[in-house]
């Protein structure tokens, strides 16, 4: 039997999405230990304090992140300045174009 002769399987229709009330009822009925609520829960405060090496590594990571942030912020500021200059140039070109159009229109009248 060839693949063209096979019958297509008809899938059941997709159910309607739940309403807001149904979602809220489901969330309210979930136990406190549900993974939805525990996945983002704060970590256990009884964990041992980090070692000095871990703290130094973390400080270095934070320092590097802050350097990256400052550099990206500077690039963003420069890009904003360049965009502003290009906008002003386009606005001036548009004004010149409107003047030229009005001159051509008045010259042909």
From Swiss-Prot:
UniProt KW keywords: Phosphoprotein
Phosphoprotein is among the record's keywords: yes
InterPro entries on file: UPF0449 (IPR028227)
Domain of life: Eukaryota
Modified residues (Phosphotyrosine): 63
Pfam families: UPF0449
Disulfide partners: none
Record family assignment: Belongs to the UPF0449 family.
PANTHER family, A to Z: UPF0449 PROTEIN C19ORF25
Name the UniProt record assigns to this protein: UPF0449 protein C19orf25 homolog
């Amino acid at each position: 039997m060839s693949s063209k002769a096979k019958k297509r399987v008809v899938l059941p229709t997709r159910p309607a999405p739940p309403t807001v009330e149904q979602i809220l009822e489901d969330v309210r009925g979930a136990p406190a230990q549900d993974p939805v609520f525990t996945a983002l829960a704060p970590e256990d405060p009884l964990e041992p304090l980090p070692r000095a090496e871990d703290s130094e590594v973390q400080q270095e990571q934070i320092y590097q992140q802050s350097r990256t942030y400052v550099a990206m912020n500077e690039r963003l500021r420069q890009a904003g300045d360049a965009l502003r200059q290009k906008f002003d140039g386009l606005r001036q070109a548009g004004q010149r174009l409107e003047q030229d159009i009005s001159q051509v229109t008045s010259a042909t009248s």
